[in-house]
Amino acid sequence: MGTNEKLNLTMLCDFYELTMSHGYFEKGYRDRITYFDLFFRRCPDGGGFAIAAGLEQIIEYIQDLHFSADDIDYLRERNLFSEEFLEYLANFKFTGDIWAVPEGTPIFPQEPIITVRAPAIEAQLIETFLLLCINHQSLIATKANRVVRAAQGRTVLEFGSRRAQGADAAILGARAAYIGGCHGTACTISDQLFGVHAGGTMAHAWVQMFDTEYEAFKAYCEMYPENCTLLVDTYNTLKSGVPNAIRVFNEVLKPKGITKCGIRLDSGDMAYLTRKARQMLDEAGWTECQISVSNSLDEYIIQDILRQGAQIDLFGVGERLITARSEPVFGGVYKLAAVVNEDGEVVPKIKISENVGKITNPHFKKLYRFIGNDTGKAIADYLCVYDETVDDSQDIEIFDPEATWKRKTVYNYTAKELQVPIFQSGKLVYKSPSLSEIRKYCLEQVDTLWDEVKRFDNPQTYYVDLSQKLWDIKYGLLKKNS
């Protein structure tokens, strides 16, 4: 298959999804309605929250879900599956329901980002791809949001395509970084596909191509006078790079009345060099010249150099963002929460572990976020059984699901149900917002979190509480199965 030929991603699944599905088919469970939750157990980098991303690619996948003739032939050659099961797969389509938290929403451990209600085989076969999408893009969106917050209002561009772990990681990573708050990307195809504004300056090769740095700068400035950012560290930033940039700005831009321009540094002591460069530019009258920096940046380095007085207007953040280098795995999991029995009753299911953090919250659930009416800040998230409702005109007592004696009465609040319907009976019912709308929503929602929750180090725990009914069901199942 050529690299430009569209892949049928239905077969992008762990092989045991197929062997289990075959078992469900042969043992009479193929039509049994099941409920699965996709959630994660801890925030990356020890942070206080994560950012949901990846839903749009899941929607596209579900809509195109089918097994091709080649897929069926491959599975037949494995000599593991019955002809009846292969015939079922040949006519396979998704007929279930999916609810999800919208992209850009701050999310917390142990709460369902996605809930699937579908026949057992349908729900099982989509597990791998759902996790792939959410785990990758939520990881990058979360890292991007940390970087953007560290930059304290300065522009942040995603610069990591060449260091990404594959083409999809570069393309979708740029999308996720934009959701998390980045202002644009260097990845051209992400602009073409998603509208993530692509931009860039020059590489050192441009400067080296000419006989002198001055000639390289002048040629570039003459070509792009309205968008001129010069890379000043090819030879010597302060002795030649910045002086040559100022000379070219004076010769090319000043006669045209253009005052907006830029320089970029990709090496050296960013705090020291940007302070000196800013002084030189200002003394030459180029006070509107922006200073951009790159070079293995992350949120901690950005924080440090800004504390040291760095004079920077724009950060280009590459490998440590696009690979989430400090913690390159988002631990999303997909677990069975309930099944429907022969009498049509929803029966809760639980997964128990010696590791308390791996014990699941059972049942088909609703997820609420309580927002204080007086502060506009998030108070807590609240999980309850599907047939419960929250009346936010009434006070409600919430409690720590582990340290149950820690209780709090919430009043003067608005209860917002976080999950929204995406598919109903296999039909798409959700209208996806534009990427710029998702980014705006993300920044607005992050602003509803208290600063204590947003700390990079030792953030305050944000609680995801259980209703009394859900807690009773969970601990009843623990007693029954322990």
Short names for language-model regions:
Residues 1-33, 42-44, 80-81, 86-95, ...:
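Buried, small/hydrophobic-residue-enriched core segments of structured protein domains
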Residues 2-32, 36, 45-47, 52, ...:
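Gly/Ser/Thr/Ala-enriched C-terminal appendages of enzymes
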Residues 34-90, 99:
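N-terminal, Lys/Arg-enriched amphipathic/low-complexity engagement segments
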Residues 73-74, 142-146, 160, 454-461:
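Short coil/turn segments at secondary-structure boundaries
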